Amino acid sequence: MDKLDNINKAIYDQYRAVVLCANFSDCNQVLTTIKSIVCHNRFIKFYVINSDFPTEWFVSMRKKLAKLACQIINARVSSSLVSNCKTDSSYTVFLRYFVADFVEEDKALYLDCDIVVTRDLSSLFETELGDAPIAAVKDLGGEVYFGEQIFNSGVLLINVNYWRENDIAGQLIEMTDNLHDKVTQDDQSILNMLFENRWLELPLL
């Protein structure tokens, strides 16, 4: 028997939330990331924020993940909502803005869908966020190319309560509408501007 199946669920107050954002054309990448996570973790609730994944995909995934003590949620954002946002990039860059609209847990781990997880994530979820809106890994190229310390938006431990109470989605959308043609790194630039000097640094994974 997989030793992960022997983990006592009682050690967790609730499922740990992992957020992935994609359109259906990237479903293979989403699947690869999910597989890598469940190889090393149990009691994960996956939120896939999307606008076009078919319901049948989630039905199939729920059956498979239930055997691994995991869940998956179809966090559907209407295409009309994201199409109203101004951007020079794919609308999928906006999807992570809506984390607090769907996630029930106090914190959530957002991962880009090109990430492969190679270890237990428990210690990461135990990070105390306090009043910080996010914890993130420093982007090593920030000081070299931009002369400033910035974070990489591909891995974010999100303080969901903070996002909800402070309407972070609304702030991000407004900033994107106003600045999308003035920034160099799309949504990563916007996130860094909003959370400047307010984010916690995570160790390199």
Region locations from a protein language model:
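Active-site-proximal specificity loops/subdomain of glycosyltransferases
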Residues: 56-58, 63-102
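N-proximal low-complexity "stem/linker" segments adjacent to membrane-targeting elements
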Residues: 1-32
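Short, acidic, metal-binding catalytic loop of nucleotide-sugar glycosyltransferases
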Residues: 36-44
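Conserved donor-nucleotide/metal-binding helix-loop-beta segment in metal-dependent transferases, i.e.
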Residues: 115-146
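Short aromatic/hydrophobic "clamp" motif used to bind/position activated sugar donors
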Residues: 108
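Catalytic core and acceptor-binding pocket of nucleotide-sugar-dependent glycosyltransferases
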Residues: 150-205
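Short internal beta-strands
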Residues: 45-52, 136
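Catalytic metal- and UDP-sugar-binding loop of GT-A-like glycosyltransferases, i.e.
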Residues: 111
